[in-house]
Amino acid sequence: MLVYKVVEVSMVSEDTLEEVLNELTAQGWRFDGMHFAMRESQKRPSMAFVIFTRDEAEQ
């Protein structure tokens, strides 16, 4: 069975996203996607959701 993990990143920057990606993939999670929450008045995302998956048997 496929298991999902969603990590909420409230401080969206290259460094924080890189840290989350490196940390979770080192734990055996596979990167599945990234979604950004935007505010109309700003050009930068206010939040990011990073999605990972792995097989339940790998836990």
PLM feature spans:
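Terminus-proximal functional modules
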Residues: 1-59
